[in-house]
């Protein structure tokens, strides 16, 4: 008798995706982050759903409703901090996942890669709108500053900003629509994840060597299911430690002050996971130029498959490219640090240098070094 998981219309899909899926035998722990992102999304949707039951998206009561969740709702504090720090964990996994794709050349699967970029934008939009909801000082001023960037778009900019605000400033209408979109977007993200996996399973997974692994495949279950579960345990332990021991470590103390349109905080900055892009934005002393650089800093991922000039897919056997990759990582850490610093000497020049270096590494150095490595292979 044929096994039900191979014949049942629904179970058949799950079986071919998570049980009998052929996977390369050499996948390292860097391939764990896809499933970890799935867990993060699940945690965020669940905690967010329960938070939405108690939250009110009105400027008069939003801040108090978050306080009420933390003080009066059973385990409300746990839900709130799991959701806030879960977002940080989400972005850690997301950046490591993208980094893995860059290092091992996974971007040559162009459909999977492009949907991944769409997912990155969707998650960033969701996180930004979520940060506005507690209606603290940094929520309000962060929303004001970031939405105001759209006014740099020629001709339609000002009208566009007022249309997004639903008025002449960030106010009740803005908060209500941000809550609506923040609730909706994770489900769109979940749908995009399905498409991401659909395209991935068309080609099969890449592997650390970058060499086709068709002759050497193993079933996903039990090998990688067990490996993924270990990853879940490690990540959830780290998240629990963060939530239970220092829940405000990654937050901004200004967000414990209710939003006040008449009082600007001394340093307006987004959450840590946006600081690298914020540093690039600030490093250009022109509004439109800064906005274009900000968008380009992420959209640049879309042209990476075109910039791949190496004859090898992975960086595993390319020491010069590896050096450049880690220089890029160091540059991103520098930008993240600069994004949290005030706009003054020497931070301005460090930020500008790091921003130029970021684009140079991706657009110029990496393709050039790859061509050099191709010649070195002939020797």
From Swiss-Prot:
<keyword id="KW-0999">Mitochondrion inner membrane</keyword>
<keyword id="KW-0496">Mitochondrion</keyword>
<dbReference type="Pfam" id="PF00033">
    <property type="entry name" value="Cytochrome_B"/>
</dbReference>
<dbReference type="InterPro" id="IPR016174">
    <property type="entry name" value="Di-haem_cyt_TM"/>
</dbReference>
<dbReference type="GO" id="GO:0005743">
    <property type="term" value="C:mitochondrial inner membrane"/>
</dbReference>
<feature type="transmembrane region" description="Helical">
    <location>
        <begin position="33"/>
        <end position="53"/>
    </location>
</feature>
<keyword id="KW-0349">Heme</keyword>
<dbReference type="InterPro" id="IPR005798">
    <property type="entry name" value="Cyt_b/b6_C"/>
</dbReference>
<dbReference type="Pfam" id="PF00032">
    <property type="entry name" value="Cytochrom_B_C"/>
</dbReference>
<feature type="binding site" description="axial binding residue">
    <location>
        <position position="83"/>
    </location>
    <ligand>
        <name>heme b b562</name>
    </ligand>
</feature>
<dbReference type="InterPro" id="IPR036150">
    <property type="entry name" value="Cyt_b/b6_C_sf"/>
</dbReference>
<protein>
    <recommendedName>
        <fullName>Cytochrome b</fullName>
    </recommendedName>
</protein>
<feature type="transmembrane region" description="Helical">
    <location>
        <begin position="288"/>
        <end position="308"/>
    </location>
</feature>
<comment type="function">
    <text>Component of the ubiquinol-cytochrome c reductase complex (complex III or cytochrome b-c1 complex) that is part of the mitochondrial respiratory chain. The b-c1 complex mediates electron transfer from ubiquinol to cytochrome c. Contributes to the generation of a proton gradient across the mitochondrial membrane that is then used for ATP synthesis.</text>
</comment>
<feature type="transmembrane region" description="Helical">
    <location>
        <begin position="226"/>
        <end position="246"/>
    </location>
</feature>
<feature type="binding site" description="axial binding residue">
    <location>
        <position position="97"/>
    </location>
    <ligand>
        <name>heme b b566</name>
    </ligand>
</feature>
<dbReference type="InterPro" id="IPR027387">
    <property type="entry name" value="Cytb/b6-like_sf"/>
</dbReference>
<feature type="transmembrane region" description="Helical">
    <location>
        <begin position="178"/>
        <end position="198"/>
    </location>
</feature>
<keyword id="KW-0408">Iron</keyword>
<dbReference type="InterPro" id="IPR048260">
    <property type="entry name" value="Cytochrome_b_C_euk/bac"/>
</dbReference>
<keyword id="KW-0812">Transmembrane</keyword>
<dbReference type="InterPro" id="IPR048259">
    <property type="entry name" value="Cytochrome_b_N_euk/bac"/>
</dbReference>
<feature type="binding site" description="axial binding residue">
    <location>
        <position position="182"/>
    </location>
    <ligand>
        <name>heme b b562</name>
    </ligand>
</feature>
<feature type="transmembrane region" description="Helical">
    <location>
        <begin position="113"/>
        <end position="133"/>
    </location>
</feature>
<keyword id="KW-1133">Transmembrane helix</keyword>
<feature type="transmembrane region" description="Helical">
    <location>
        <begin position="320"/>
        <end position="340"/>
    </location>
</feature>
<keyword id="KW-0479">Metal-binding</keyword>
<feature type="binding site">
    <location>
        <position position="201"/>
    </location>
    <ligand>
        <name>a ubiquinone</name>
    </ligand>
</feature>
<dbReference type="InterPro" id="IPR005797">
    <property type="entry name" value="Cyt_b/b6_N"/>
</dbReference>
<keyword id="KW-0813">Transport</keyword>
<dbReference type="GO" id="GO:0008121">
    <property type="term" value="F:ubiquinol-cytochrome-c reductase activity"/>
</dbReference>
<comment type="subunit">
    <text>The cytochrome bc1 complex contains 11 subunits: 3 respiratory subunits (MT-CYB, CYC1 and UQCRFS1), 2 core proteins (UQCRC1 and UQCRC2) and 6 low-molecular weight proteins (UQCRH/QCR6, UQCRB/QCR7, UQCRQ/QCR8, UQCR10/QCR9, UQCR11/QCR10 and a cleavage product of UQCRFS1). This cytochrome bc1 complex then forms a dimer.</text>
</comment>
<dbReference type="GO" id="GO:0046872">
    <property type="term" value="F:metal ion binding"/>
</dbReference>
<dbReference type="GO" id="GO:0045275">
    <property type="term" value="C:respiratory chain complex III"/>
</dbReference>
<feature type="binding site" description="axial binding residue">
    <location>
        <position position="196"/>
    </location>
    <ligand>
        <name>heme b b566</name>
    </ligand>
</feature>
<dbReference type="GO" id="GO:0006122">
    <property type="term" value="P:mitochondrial electron transport, ubiquinol to cytochrome c"/>
</dbReference>
<keyword id="KW-0249">Electron transport</keyword>
<feature type="transmembrane region" description="Helical">
    <location>
        <begin position="347"/>
        <end position="367"/>
    </location>
</feature>
<comment type="similarity">
    <text>Belongs to the cytochrome b family.</text>
</comment>
<dbReference type="InterPro" id="IPR030689">
    <property type="entry name" value="Cytochrome_b"/>
</dbReference>
<keyword id="KW-0679">Respiratory chain</keyword>
<keyword id="KW-0472">Membrane</keyword>
